[in-house]
Amino acid sequence: VLAVQSLGSTVAEFEDQPQVSLSNWNGATVRSGTFDDQNGIFWQYDGGNLAAVQRTSTRQITGTVTATPDSNSITGDGTRFREQLKAVDRIVVRGMTHVVAQVNSNTQMFVTPDYRGVNVSAGVKACLVLDKVAKQSEFNLDTIDGNGPSGYNFDPGKMQMIGIQFSWYGAGFIDFMTRGSNGDFVFAHRMRNSNVNTEAFMRTGNQPVRLSLIHI
């Protein structure tokens, strides 16, 4: 490890249990909640910003697509790939998640990984995976930065207990919570779905509870 600024001392004196905590970084995101590649609700921290996220894959893109086994080429009929998609977007074709690698035209694009179906899938709908991100500064109940109603200051360098409560059918609220200083949950952010959505925001409520670290 190379120092990028002058050190306060090169002969540090350690206490009983010296520790090093990493609280800021670039190029990676830590996520925790109930989610998979297509649906879910989770907290995330990217080394600088804490956020609450709702992931959906119910938005169908225009037209239909054709996918061939072991090929990364997706062709469309009546599609508008250039207008609706871009590189690094994620789409779902016949239940499988693919990352858009290149959009050649409104009717042709390339994805990764290759389509893994057994047979050619023609005339099928494709869905776009969307992440609805609410940054900490946008939390509508408590910004948990020491300035909210609870006075709680969320320190990403320390162990935290987080919570999420939701109704998966799409018309309920999603509440993002963290355990406060007095042991009670602090409600930080609420995402409203009632009188907002026209369909369920997730395809299933049967989601794994997981912690993930992804490189961006």
Go through each PLM region and give its residues.
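Localized edge beta-strand/strand-to-loop motifs within extracellular or lumenal beta-rich domains
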Residues: 158-172
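Noncatalytic modules at the cell exterior or secretory-pathway interfaces
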Residues: 206-211
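Short, surface-exposed terminal/edge motifs of secreted or surface/virion proteins that either
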Residues: 107-111, 171-181
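Short, aromatic/His-centered strand-loop micro-motif at the edge of beta-sheets
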Residues: 132-161
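Conserved small/polar residues in nucleotide/adenosyl-binding loops
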Residues: 214-216
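Small/polar beta-strand repeat architecture
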Residues: 59-87, 92-130
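Secretory/extracellular carbohydrate-interaction modules
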Residues: 1-58
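Short, solvent-exposed beta-strand-to-loop segments that form ligand-recognition rims
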Residues: 181-203
